[in-house]
Curated annotation (Swiss-Prot):
Family under the similarity heading: Belongs to the terpene synthase family.
The species this protein was found in: Streptomyces clavuligerus
Catalytic reaction list: (2E)-geranyl diphosphate + H2O = 1,8-cineole + diphosphate; neryl diphosphate + H2O = 1,8-cineole + diphosphate
Binding site for Mg(2+) 1: D81
Keyword field contains Lipid metabolism: no
Full protein name: 1,8-cineole synthase
Source organism phylogeny: Bacteria, Bacillati, Actinomycetota, Actinomycetes, Kitasatosporales
Known EC number: 4.2.3.108
Length: 330
């Protein structure tokens, strides 16, 4: 763990896919082919983030096209998220116009010709992600992608109004409209383990999904705090706590840490209840295996997110003042 990083007790083993180096080469080639990275200097900057390592940690058993998909979706997310760090992200109308074009790529009839490279890349990803999945999963994933994408409009409005959300509103926004719901769907896709419909909506599985979602979101908030603060972005739980409670930085960090510990503990207490749940519902053994595999994917994501956020150069502070430009690959 690099010096200066907040540390958390994440009681899951740290793992990384042994094919991550080759996966990164394929991933960077895809980013260049999609027009998301242009030129050798941009590629060198991007590689310093260890971009494929996050997918390799989340999907430590994946191979081939499955691993590539996982890495490519993360890479697209970095580029899409950073796109709104510029002028578009402070203009709700521009943001809405851009986001609506991205959402349109989820339509089976969508033609990406002439679209922005981010939307062309998203169309490619959605075709690859959705193809082997059930219609039920696809409908759920469309809803989650749409919620995530349209949340950028809310964030742009907040930036324009210089609005800081309440703690409760922020946690709800992160839970419903952050990148995590699409990533939880991605776990099912890459691990080839679709959660059986009868158990997906149960309190036990929803608790596991919720605690995974919030754990990863807020660990990310803590470890990216300096970068986001330097950029003037108020959408970070530590900053929200400080603003609402008029607390010190250390007090806000301590509150965030307690939340993360509680979510981790809840996950650990809930997981052992799954076999009995499946027994009560009469879930076939093959479907139980899919559920257990998806939950292992959640555990790998919780740990992998923490490890990668702590090791990547993406969250280094590139803007010592509020006027300088960040060193990014875009």
């Amino acid at each position: 763990m690099p010096a200066g990083h907040e540390e958390f007790d994440i009681p899951f083993p740290s793992r990384v896919n042994p094919f991550h180096a080759r996966a990164e080469d394929r991933h960077v080639a895809w980013m260049r082919a999609m027009g998301l990275i242009t030129g050798d200097a941009a590629e060198a900057t991007y590689r310093r983030w260890s971009p494929a390592k996050v997918g390799a940690r989340w999907f430590y058993l994946a191979q081939g096209e499955d691993l590539d998909l996982g890495c490519d979706i993360f890479g697209w997310f970095f580029a899409y998220d950073d796109h709104f760090d510029g002028p578009t992200g402070t203009d709700p109308r521009q943001t809405a116009a851009f986001v609506n074009r991205t959402v349109a790529m989820l339509d089976p009839r969508a033609d990406p010709t002439g679209e922005h490279p981010l939307n062309i890349a998203f169309h490619d990803l959605w075709q690859r992600e959705s193809a082997p999945m059930s219609p039920l999963w696809q409908r759920r994933a469309v809803d989650h992608w749409t919620q995530y994408l349209t949340a950028h409009i809310t964030e742009a409005t907040n930036r324009t109004r210089h609005t800081s959300p309440t703690i409760a509103d922020y946690l709800e926004l992160r839970h419903r409209t952050g990148f995590m719901p699409p990533l939880l769907d991605l776990i099912e896709r890459v691990w080839r383990a679709e959660i059986p419909a009868p158990v997906y909506t149960t309190p036990e599985v929803q608790t596991l999904l919720h605690t995974t979602n919030q754990n990863i979101n807020i660990v990310n908030d803590v470890l990216s705090l300096e970068k986001e603060e330097a950029h003037g972005d108020p959408h970070n739980l530590v900053l929200v706590i400080q603003h609402e409670r008029q607390s010190t930085r250390q007090q806000a960090l301590a509150t965030a840490r307690r939340m993360i510990d509680e979510w981790t503990d809840t996950f650990i207490r809930t997981e052992p209840r799954l076999p009995a749940l499946c027994g009560r519902l009469g879930i076939p053994l093959a479907d139980r295996t899919s559920l257990y595999t998806a939950v292992e994917g959640m555990r790998a994501a919780i740990r992998g997110n923490y490890d990668w956020c702590a090791e990547t150069n993406r969250y280094a502070v590139h803007r010592p003042t509020g006027t300088g430009r960040a060193t990014t690959p875009w």
